[in-house]
């Protein structure tokens, strides 16, 4: 008799965005002629950079000819993209990586969810709260999170990110084995300074903590004093794995490409105390479970690092950040408190009074016909907030703000 992984049964029946879809579908049934504007799920709307499109066309043509055909590629990624990543994303910031420390993948979601494969099931977990749901759910699946009680997992240490602490959590007074950090932050849209990030690196060095650092939105940072990589902090290579994505940087949500940096000097321990390089373990995991990102996709990603590609990516980011400014100004004009939207494409909106996240979501849906994401879906500290994204079309963002202003003013 085959037995199931019963940890999966601990997961709530529905993923956050499935619950939202159900409520939206119920609304559409009762209001079939109403035009909804969706500012909830963070999917992009701008086309791919032209340089990427041309590079992928060329790659397809290469696959059509025997002389230039490519079959299986290296599980770690092609050298041409790894070199482009190191030269453009890290070297200019004084961070020097070896090619063997960068692993090309099909996206940050896959890697943040799969990294637990190389870590023991009984490691203690610390997460900023609110948080991207994948971090929690992937740990539930492997038995690391414990039992869900009153919206919290029993074996997870929650580090509240509140307006009172500028959405940067306090250093815990206990030791944590694995710590998830995401900056610029999803869902709050806030950032962390070098001084604050240095505190976390020092904590990790002192406590032998592994930091899993999600920097998927670093390209949206506008403030020159905000770090783009945790490796800008001295000592971080000894304690941190960094995840990045081309999804929001270059519109690759439907193409799928990202990468993970695992420094060779980063180690973790066996029960007997032997130190094992995590780079070696991740490489072994990828060689077994991943057959590499497609050649076509990697050529498209490489193209964003050309001079013209950089211009086109910058234009895409500026478009979304202009949306964020328009939205933030409009929302604040109604008296709402709004966080984020300055160095990230997310706005974290406080519901008026003591209104709950789901109530605020439903009011916005039924009164303004705008779809957001209830903050409590990202964790207990998200209660009373809603997340809006700036990834929509300009006209939709402007119309959504008109509707919300009309509703609230």
UniProtKB/Swiss-Prot annotation:
Please provide the Gene Ontology terms (biological process) for this protein: lysine biosynthetic process via diaminopimelate, diaminopimelate-aminotransferase pathway
Determine the domain of life of the protein's source: Bacteria
N6-(pyridoxal phosphate)lysine modification sites are 248
Q: Which UniProt keywords apply?
A: Aminotransferase, Pyridoxal phosphate, Transferase
Against CDD domains, the record matches this protein to: AAT_like (cd00609)
* Record flagged with keyword Repeat: no
What is this enzyme's catalytic activity, as reactions? (2S,6S)-2,6-diaminopimelate + 2-oxoglutarate = (S)-2,3,4,5-tetrahydrodipicolinate + L-glutamate + H2O + H(+)
In this chain, substrate is annotated as bound at: 15, 42, 109, 132, 186, 291, 387
What cofactor is needed? Answer: pyridoxal 5'-phosphate
> Mind listing the GO molecular function terms for this protein?
L,L-diaminopimelate aminotransferase activity; pyridoxal phosphate binding
Q: Name one Pfam family in it.
A: Aminotran_1_2
Q: Which residues form a coiled coil?
A: none
Pathway info: Amino-acid biosynthesis; L-lysine biosynthesis via DAP pathway; LL-2,6-diaminopimelate from (S)-tetrahydrodipicolinate (aminotransferase route): step 1/1
**EC number(s) for this protein?**
2.6.1.83
Please state which protein family the record places this protein in: Belongs to the class-I pyridoxal-phosphate-dependent aminotransferase family. LL-diaminopimelate aminotransferase subfamily.
Q: What does this protein do?
A: Involved in the synthesis of meso-diaminopimelate (m-DAP or DL-DAP), required for both lysine and peptidoglycan biosynthesis. Catalyzes the direct conversion of tetrahydrodipicolinate to LL-diaminopimelate.
Assembly information from the UniProt record: Homodimer.
What is the designated name of this protein? LL-diaminopimelate aminotransferase
Taxon lineage: Bacteria, Pseudomonadati, Bacteroidota, Bacteroidia, Bacteroidales
